[in-house]
Amino acid sequence: MSRISNLSLSHNQLRLAAFCMFILSISGCATSKSVQTAPPFPVHREPVLREKEIERNRFTVAQGEDVIGRPAVVRIEKDDTLPDIARHFSLGIKEISAANPKVDVWVPEAGERVVLPLSFILPDAPRKGIVVNLASMRLFQYKEDGTSLSVTTYPVGIGTDERPTPTGRMHVVRKAARPTWHVPSSIAADHRKKGDILPKTVPPGPENPLGEYALYLNKGSYLIHGTNKPASIGLTATNGCLRLYPENIKALFDDTPVKTPVLIVDQPYLVGQRNGVLYLEAHGPADESGALESEKLHKKLRAIEKQAARAIDWKKVKEVQAEARGIPVPIFESGRGTEMEAAKPVEVEHPETLYGKPEIPALKLHAWYVLAADVRDRIEARRLAAIINHQGPQIPARVFEKSESYRVIAGPFNDGGEAKEAAKRLKIDLEIDGIVIEPDKNG
């Protein structure tokens, strides 16, 4: 349990905090000073596109081609985080962090150019129904109207190493809007070990981890569903189900009939062509399968090289594999016209508002708070506040300076019950021993 204290903030301290605090964004695991990362390709010098002009979900698949979309870059603004950029552009957290390995995920520097990996190689699988590639943490839904093939793609959260998402053929057996979560006994046992007692069922609402929509598969108790933890999309964070952003699961739910086939594959190396250019997209494979997957890739590329009568740049292949940035990269040896053939990334304007970015309510004098941390490093404090801010459901948090330290304060909360529940969640989810701060009764 978290420590409960009668510590209180005075009226003057709260006023000082209101002036001194600066709101920041999400969780962190990077250097205190991020380094500018050059995109792995030249940026096309066109006028900057409006962000609505860049497609992120729906594409037409040209006959005989395997690559969709177009990479882009966007400049970071103050208080941005990569997870918020990722959600706005329908990317997963691992996708955007892998594409920008030297950019601080949670406290990037204003002015940095961030790669948006909005180009994808389709999985090597039948283009029918729903196909999910676990390695890229991405779902593809195919639709054919008799004359053309279209694909809609979304990032997904997948199972952990302990409870992985299974591969294989399945299909949708039923659909549910505002589903009730029937808590599996294994999950209840895991939570019980951490002091979190779950009910047998969780009704629809903000505490339901299934979100607002669910597609039930015929295999075991696996689902494709929404979430109340959007910052987990693009991570290995589920108990085996496939998890989508709330806005994406609604679109998928509306567009997916019962009996739709679902194929789940695990393909870390994707090879495809568009406009005569051969691309390789690499995602880090599991350690035990890395050598085998690399051998399969090289065998496939040697066959393509022989059939195309065009040399592959094997040094580039090695670089793409090693970096595993999840971005399609041309791998034919350079020749006249090669650069013109490859899809050029474009610069996109920064959105006025990032969709889904957590909002932090104003401080209230007579509210309850939780002191989550008191640290000497400003960046560390900002990261922690950001992590807390992106819990699901959200726990609002902010940082303000006190003497030579930085305090991370969660709140405001309406009453002691809310504050104590937030402190409990901080302990269970983040192993933070928070201190509940009562309102100043004299203020």
Question: What is the meaning of each model-derived region?
Answer:
Residues 55-90, 375, 400, 404:
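Primarily a LysM-type cell-wall glycan-binding module
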Residues 288, 371-380:
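Short, surface-exposed ligand-recognition loops at beta-strand->loop->(often short) alpha-helix junctions
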